[in-house]
């Protein structure tokens, strides 16, 4: 009888475990939510992924460079950050189209980039992030 109750306890304990979704997928906002948060100046929930490595204050770098003033700037513009050779040589300017392509798949746009983030799949989330970057 003890082994039966032990199995039942184990089953109940495991029932509380997650559905197998990765945390970032489970916590990702819906497309509608991301679009609503794209209001000028609003920091969208999707930006939390960016904030893991990037600061928004000018000159304050984290694992990645500060994103202050990034919209409209040439790639590798932050003088106090050690960019990859690939990023320095890219010749990119961070406009809406370039940011959208980079956020979708950083390594496809700039092979050799230091950014290991796999990208933001949802176009509405990318649009919300880009709208926010434009305000920094």
Label every PLM stretch briefly.
Residues 1-16:
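Sec-dependent bacterial lipoprotein signal peptides
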Residues 17-21:
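Bacterial signal peptide processing site
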Residues 33-60, 67:
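Sequence/structural segment immediately N-terminal to covalent heme-attachment motifs in c-type
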Residues 39-43, 57-60, 92, 96, ...:
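Solvent-exposed, acidic/flexible segments
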Residues 41-48, 65, 69, 97, ...:
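Solvent-exposed, polar/charged alpha-helical surfaces in well-ordered, non-transmembrane soluble domains
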Residues 51-58, 72, 104-108, 134-135:
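Sec-exported extracytoplasmic/periplasmic mature domains
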Residues 55-93:
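Gly/Gly-Pro-rich "capping" loops immediately C-terminal to redox-active cysteine motifs
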Residues 95-136:
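C-terminal capping alpha-helices of c-type cytochrome domains
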